[in-house]
Amino acid sequence: MGISGSTEYTPKKRTNFGTIRDQYKTLEEVQDALRESGLESSNLILGIDYTKSNTWTGKRSFNGRCLHAIDGSGRTMNPYQQAIHICANTLEPFDDDHLIPAYGFGDVTTTDKGVFPFFPEERMCNGVAEVLQRYNEITPRVNMSGPTSFAPIINKAIDIVQQTKQYHILIIIADGQVTSPNATQDAIIRASNYPLSIVTIGVGDGPWEMMEHFDDTIQGRRFDNFQFVNFHEVMSRRNVENYEAEFAVAALQEIPDQYQCIKELNML
């Protein structure tokens, strides 16, 4: 186990706590680093963007279809289904109970004010398979709306962390069209006071400037708690043998260092 001594360390960003680097090249290196950091178990929280911009931001990357379009035959996955499958499957071995709280946001019932649970009474999904099954069931019935803010799902994740007093990884899958950047930025700063990592997966055509701002330049955080990954860019790279592993490495790149920061800040 461990990180190869030949790994190139590339400084990525400076925060109040220190520099977090993109340093891992393979999924095995990331998983080894997670274990070396002491992360024996974690808990996942999933947030899905149901804002109306999903209907047009797949013009280039998803052949003009809505990013939430579901193939009734089951032969192909949309970007949301792919991202859920890859990311959650990678992290599920670290999730002891395999129970995943899953929420949607940005639909006509929640707009930018709240979230809705995938199951009534906030019942959690039992593993990745049930997350995907429930996503397939509810998505055709969701009335997409807006405006777009990540603040409600981040604040919901903070509530869960406060209740459980355990480390969680919030995975937000979204098309990147944030229309409430100040509220989202404030929520990211607030989240840095808790044992919570935020991984945002951008699906569709972008633009991604706001996501890159959240990833790189937010001041006032206790540690660098936000990682952004451009799904289409990763999945379009050439000369890649295993696209799922490539995507998982990009999405989980900063989790080992984030968890180490959380421990050093005595949040657990």
Language-model-detected regions and their locations in the chain:
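Acidic, low-complexity intrinsically disordered regions
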Residues: 1-268
